[in-house]
Amino acid sequence: MSHEIMRLSAFAPAKVNLFLHVGGPDGEGYHPISSLMVFADVGDRVNLQPADAPAFETSGPFGDQIPAGGDNLVVRAGQAFHRRLGGPVPPYRLILEKHLPIAAGLGGGSSDAGAALKLLRDALAPALSDDDLEALAASLGADGAACLRARALIAEGRGERLSPAPRLPELNAVLVNPGAPSPTGAVYRAYDAGVHPDGAAMPPMPDHLESAEEAAAWLAFATRNDLEAPAVRLEPHIGEVLDVLRGEPESLLVRMSGSGATCFALCASDIEAEGLAERLETMRPDWWVRRCRLS
């Protein structure tokens, strides 16, 4: 093992749930889900650098809003990796450039942790298998393994049963966050207060979808986000974002991602997504707005 860590950097993409079906809690309090997850070309970045002593730092527009101690998933990823190696490691610094909003339904913490795990494997244990790395990611949270893979997939069970997604067309989208956090635990508790006859059943999946229009039509007809209504009840600003997006001509499908508060609009093309994003930035400069491509 080298006595000094090499300098490395990894992108941590935003996760978007195109649909999220949720069942009632099981005996241990976990909710079964089925979800089609895709990943955006916008996200955070994690940097690994040599250091005289172990350190974790944050930067970026949302860097001052995240915990720097053991509650941060990047720190926990490092701790889990050290336990897996079982021996001393050279000191290093992890720097999280936080560009995604906090508690936003974009899997940011899990994606950051996945990026950190990849960097640590590259620097310290390149022989560590993908399965071992995925087990570490899964131990950090329900989205951990999915965000480590960072490609379109179907998640079922508690989020741990992953399978390839059907072939998807190019999906251009606009992500919008109203600047209000939507804590996952609170949204699930609000969900549990209701009645949910549909449960987490997986809809029949087409083999492939030829266009963004076809994908949006199928998603609107066959799927939903079961956490959207309880999240809107808790945070009305989410409902405001959804209403605005649904009133825009470029929007093929409008939905909340994960437990919110970020919402997305699928658009027919990159040009339409760009136009929608620019208009929203002018209309609502207080909102976080990003045009992106999903895959």
From Swiss-Prot:
Kinase as UniProt keyword: yes
UniProt key word Iron-sulfur: no
Keyword entries, A-Z: ATP-binding, Isoprene biosynthesis, Kinase, Nucleotide-binding, Transferase
Known function: Catalyzes the phosphorylation of the position 2 hydroxy group of 4-diphosphocytidyl-2C-methyl-D-erythritol.
Lineage top rank: taxon: Bacteria
Cited Gene3D superfamilies: 3.30.230.10, GHMP kinase, C-terminal domain
Protein name (Swiss-Prot/TrEMBL): 4-diphosphocytidyl-2-C-methyl-D-erythritol kinase
Xref: Pfam families: GHMP_kinases_C, GHMP_kinases_N
Entry annotation: catalytic residues: K15, D143
Cystine crosslinks: none
Family per record: Belongs to the GHMP kinase family. IspE subfamily.
Catalytic activity: 4-CDP-2-C-methyl-D-erythritol + ATP = 4-CDP-2-C-methyl-D-erythritol 2-phosphate + ADP + H(+)
MF GO annotations: 4-(cytidine 5'-diphospho)-2-C-methyl-D-erythritol kinase activity; ATP binding
UniProt xrefs under SUPFAM superfamilies: GHMP Kinase, C-terminal domain (SSF55060), Ribosomal protein S5 domain 2-like (SSF54211)
Pathways per UniProt: Isoprenoid biosynthesis; isopentenyl diphosphate biosynthesis via DXP pathway; isopentenyl diphosphate from 1-deoxy-D-xylulose 5-phosphate: step 3/6
Binding residue positions for ATP: P101, I102, A103, A104, G105, L106, G107, G108, G109, S110, S111
EC number of the protein: 2.7.1.148
Species per Swiss-Prot/TrEMBL record: Caulobacter vibrioides (strain ATCC 19089 / CIP 103742 / CB 15) (Caulobacter crescentus)
A biological process term (GO) from this entry: terpenoid biosynthetic process
Encoding gene, per UniProt annotation: ispE
Alphabetized HAMAP family for the sequence: IspE
